[in-house]
C-alpha cells in the first residue's frame, strides 16, 4: 500500500487524466472528427487536415501512455491484491492482466495508425480520390472502431471491475 494519501491521490489523478485524454480523444475522433471530415472536406484537404491533427493527437497519446506506465506501476505494486507482475492467483490479477493486454493492443494499433497509416493517407489524399485512399480510410475507421469502442470500453470496464475485487 502507498501510505501517503497525497502521493496516492496524485498518482491516481494523473493516471485517470491520462486515461481520459487517450480514450476520450479516441471517442471524440471516431464519433465527431472523422465523420465530419469525411462529410465536409474534399479528399486532399481532408488528408492535410487529418495529417496535421494526428501530429498533435500523437503527442497526447504518447504522453498519456508514458504517464499511464509511470503511474500504473507503483499503483499496481501498492495494491493489496498484487502478487507479481504476471500472476493469475486472484480475480484482480486476472482482470489486470486482461486489461493490460488490451492496453498493449491499443498502443500497437495507435503506433500503426500514427506512424504508418496516417502518413499513407496524407500522401495519397494529396493526389486526389482513388480506390487506394478509400481502402486506407476504411482501414483507419476499422482501427478507430476497434480501439475506440471495443478495446477502450473493455479497458474502462475492467478498470471499474478491478476497483471492487
Region spans (language model):
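Polytopic transmembrane helical bundles with strong interfacial aromatic enrichment
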Residues: 1-165
Amino acid at each position: 500500500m502507498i501510505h501517503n494519501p497525497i502521493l496516492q491521490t496524485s498518482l491516481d489523478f494523473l493516471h485517470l487524466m491520462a486515461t481520459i485524454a487517450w480514450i476520450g480523444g479516441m471517442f471524440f475522433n471516431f464519433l465527431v472528427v472523422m465523420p465530419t471530415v469525411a462529410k465536409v472536406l474534399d479528399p486532399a484537404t481532408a488528408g492535410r487536415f487529418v495529417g496535421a491533427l494526428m501530429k498533435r493527437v500523437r503527442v497526447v497519446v504518447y504522453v498519456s501512455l508514458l504517464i499511464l506506465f509511470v503511474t500504473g506501476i507503483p499503483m499496481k505494486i501498492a495494491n493489496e491484491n498484487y502478487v507479481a507482475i504476471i500472476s493469475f492467483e486472484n480475480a484482480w490479477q486476472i482482470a489486470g492482466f486482461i486489461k493490460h493486454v488490451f492496453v498493449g493492443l491499443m498502443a500497437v494499433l495507435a503506433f500503426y495508425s500514427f506512424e504508418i497509416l496516417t502518413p499513407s493517407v496524407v500522401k495519397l489524399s494529396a493526389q486526389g480520390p482513388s480506390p487506394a485512399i478509400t481502402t486506407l480510410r476504411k482501414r483507419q475507421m476499422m482501427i478507430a472502431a476497434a480501439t475506440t469502442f471495443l478495446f477502450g470500453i473493455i479497458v474502462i470496464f475492467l478498470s471499474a471491475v478491478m476497483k471492487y475485487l
